[in-house]
Amino acid sequence: MPANLNRKQQREIKAVVERAKKDNGIPQTAQQSIPFQRMFPDGICRVTDSYYTKTIQFQDINYQLAQQEDKTAIFDEWCSFLNFFDSSIHFELSFMNLSTDAESFEKSIRIPFKKDSFNPVRAEYSQMLKKQLAQGNNGLTKTKYLTFGIEAESMRQAKPRLNHIENDLLNNFRRLGVIATTMNGKERLHLMHSMFHMGDNDKFFFDWKYLVESGLSVKDFIAPTAFAFKTNRTFQMGSIFGSMSYLAITASDLSDRMLADFLDMESTQIVTMHIQSVDQTAAIKTIKRTITELDRSKIEEQKKAVRSGYDMDIIPSDLATYGKDAKSLLKELQSQNERMFMVTFLVLNTGRTEQELENNVFQAQSIAQKHNCNLRRLDFQQESGLMSSLPLAQNLIEIRRGLTTSSTAIFVPFTTQELFQNGGETLYYGLNALSNNLIMVDRKKLKNPNGLILGTPGSGKSFSAKREITNAFL
C-alpha cells in the first residue's frame, strides 16, 4: 500500500479489498444485476469486454389491413432483411408496450385557452379528445426496436463496423418503407429506465456531466429501487410484479397474426426475439449429418424387418417423416435463398398485483395455445430472462429454436401505421381503425397537405368537415 496515504484512506482501501474478496459473482445490488459495462454518448454500449451493441428504433407500417399482394411483398422484403445478418451479428427485436405518462399525454392533446369567448367550447372539445384517448390505447405506448451486436477486441475496432452495419440496416428499413432512427446513449438509457420503472412515475433525469460531478455510474440513473427474485416463477421490480416466459414453438404451421396478437394485449409487457444466424456451410453440414443418421436408422429398421420376416418397406412413421422434413430443409437452404436462424422468443408480463400478473400471463398463454404453441415460465431463470429482455442484444437464456428465414419472418413486426404528431396546430381526425389510437396531425407538415373526404350517404362527411373547421378555429 502506498506510504503517502493517511489512515482513513488506508482503511477505505482495505474495506474495498475485503468486499472484493467476498465477491462470489452474485449481484449484490440492483445496479450489479444490469448486464452491461459502459454506455457511450454516441449510442454504442460495451456489454462485455469484447461485445458491443447499438439500437435502432423503427416505426410501424400498414400490414394487417393491406391487400394480399402487398402483404406478400412486405413479407418477401422482410425475408431479405433477415438474410442480411450473417453469423457474426447477433440481433434482437424488442416490442415494448409501456404505460404512458397520462398527464403529459393529455397535455399534448389539450387545446390551450385564448382571450376570447370560446374557451368553454375548447374545454368541451378537449374533454372529448380525452375520452377518445381513454378508449383507444388504454394508456400504452407501443414502440419497436432492433438491437445488434458484434464481437470486437476494442472500441476502436467495433465502432466503424457497427456504423457500417447501422447504415446498411437503415437502408434496408427504407426499402421496406419504414421510418427508422438510431438511438444515442442517453435515449438508450431512457429506454431502460422506462423498463425498470414500469410501476411508478419516476422521471428520467440524466446528463453526461452528472457522471463527472457525482462520481455515479449510468446504472445509478436507470436502476429500480430493488429487484426481488424470491420465487422461481415471478419477481418484483420496484412496485410492480413480473414474470418471464418463453415461447415453445411447436406448431407445424405458423400464422403471421401470432406476434400481432401478443402485441394487441392491453397490458404493460415486453416481447423479445433474440435471433442468431447460423453459418450457412455449418448449417448444411449439420443437416446432411442428420440425414445420414436417419438413413442409417432406416437401414437398421429394414434389416430388423427382414430378420423378423415382414415387409422391409414398413418402417416407423416418425423415421419417414423426419427424413422427409430433413431433405426438404436441405433443399430450402441449398436452392431457395433460405438461411438457418436460432431464435429465442421471450415474453415479460407485468401486473400491479400478483393476481393481475397471473391474469395477464394466462391471457398470453391462451394466445400461444390458439396458435398451437406453448408459453412456458422460465423456472429459476427469471433474472436471466428479465436481463435478456433489455435492448442489449445479449441472450442469457439457452433455450433456442432453429427456424429458416421464412419461418422466422412469419413473426412480421408490423401491424398498422400510426399518425400522431405533437405540436400547436395538430388537429383531431378520428381513431385508427385497427389500433383505436388517436389520429392527430398537422396536415401542413405532411408531404401532401390536401384532403378528400369520402363516404356513403349519411356516413358523416359533412360532420367530419365541420369538426375539422371547428378544431382549426379553436
Q: Where in this protein do the model-derived segments appear?
A:
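Extended, folded cores of ATP/NTP-driven motor/assembly subunits in large transport
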Residues: 1-416
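Glycine-rich phosphate-binding loop of nucleotide-binding enzymes
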Residues: 61, 68, 76-83, 170, ...
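Glycine-rich nucleotide cofactor-binding entry segment
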Residues: 395-445
